[in-house]
Each structure stands twice: as structure tokens, then as C-alpha cells.
Swiss-Prot record:
Subcellular location: Cytoplasm
Superkingdom of origin: Bacteria
Gene that specifies this protein: coaD
Protein name: Phosphopantetheine adenylyltransferase
SUPFAM superfamilies for this protein: Nucleotidylyl transferase (SSF52374)
């Protein structure tokens, strides 16, 4: 039986913290789907196409990881569609745990056959968040230490425009 997992987020943008979780999940599961979720009602910092491109470039070295774009749907529905029996969630701190535990409660109500697996972010990466990265970009500070090269390239393109 193939063990498939789903790791969801907006990845606006993808960070080295996300990649840490993706890499470790790729060792635990036969296939990891990255569910790139977005809501048409909300304006992302990067377009969905750009986020997908940055993610795909960042995960290229992982042969058992792929990106799926999901619009206005529940993670449990996408998990069922791809046959994933596990949600992978990254934890940076206790606030993340509180949020994720609440999310797990509702996911279990909707799909009690899908387990949630928590992976703690590596301590050196735990302060990194997409919202902090967007703030650094806004103030034209370097994001190189915190994000994959694919994001750095997109930020540099934005600066040139």
C-alpha cells in the first residue's frame, strides 16, 4: 500500500521552513502532494501561477513530491481525490500547535480516516514565516537567507519592474 500525504498552505511565498517540512515528509511517505490553496476572495502577494512556479522549482530535487493547485475547496476533499491518508503539518511554536489542533479537530469530523502528522520545524528555521518574508520584501530587505532561490529570483524581478 502506497503511503500518500498532503501538505497544504498558501505558500505566499514558499520559505526554507516549508522546504524543511517537505523534505522530511518526502522521507516518511511514498508520495507527498503539496496542496497550494488559494481563495479568489483574497488577493495574494504573489499570483497563484507565480507561487506554483516557485514551489515547483524549489521541490524539483524531490522525486516523490508534486504540487496541486486547489481553489475554494476543503483539504479533506483534495486528500480524498488524490488518495492521501495523511495530512502533514509543520509546527514552529505553540501558537501553531493550537491552530493546527483546532484544524485537526474539524478535519477528523469530516474525514476520520485521514491522520494528521505533525513535524516540528528545525529550530534554526522556526522564526521564518511567509508574512515576515512579505514584510521584508515590502521594505526591500534581503530575503536570501530565508527562502529558496526560486523566490529570490521572483523578488529580484519585482524590484526591476
Amino acid at each position: 500500500m502506497t503511503k500518500k500525504a498532503l501538505f497544504t498552505g498558501s505558500f505566499d511565498p514558499v520559505t526554507n521552513g516549508h522546504l524543511d517540512i517537505i523534505e522530511r515528509a518526502s522521507y516518511l511517505f511514498d508520495h507527498v502532494y503539496i496542496g497550494l490553496f488559494y481563495n479568489l476572495e483574497k488577493q495574494g502577494y504573489f499570483s497563484i501561477e507565480c507561487r506554483k512556479k516557485m514551489l515547483e522549482e524549489a521541490i524539483r530535487q524531490f522525486k516523490n513530491v508534486s504540487v496541486l493547485v486547489a481553489q475554494d475547496r476543503l483539504a479533506v476533499d483534495l486528500a480524498r481525490e488524490v488518495g492521501a491518508k495523511y495530512f502533514v503539518r509543520g509546527l514552529r511554536n505553540s501558537q501553531d500547535f493550537d491552530y493546527e489542533a483546532n484544524l485537526e479537530f474539524f478535519n477528523k469530523q469530516l474525514a476520520d480516516d485521514i491522520e494528521t502528522v505533525y513535524l516540528s520545524t528545525s529550530p534554526s528555521l522556526s522564526p521564518i514565516s511567509s508574512s515576515r518574508i512579505r514584510e521584508l520584501i515590502h521594505f526591500k530587505a534581503s530575503v536570501k537567507p530565508f527562502v529558496p532561490k526560486s523566490v529570490v529570483r521572483e523578488v529580484e524581478k519585482m524590484s526591476e519592474e
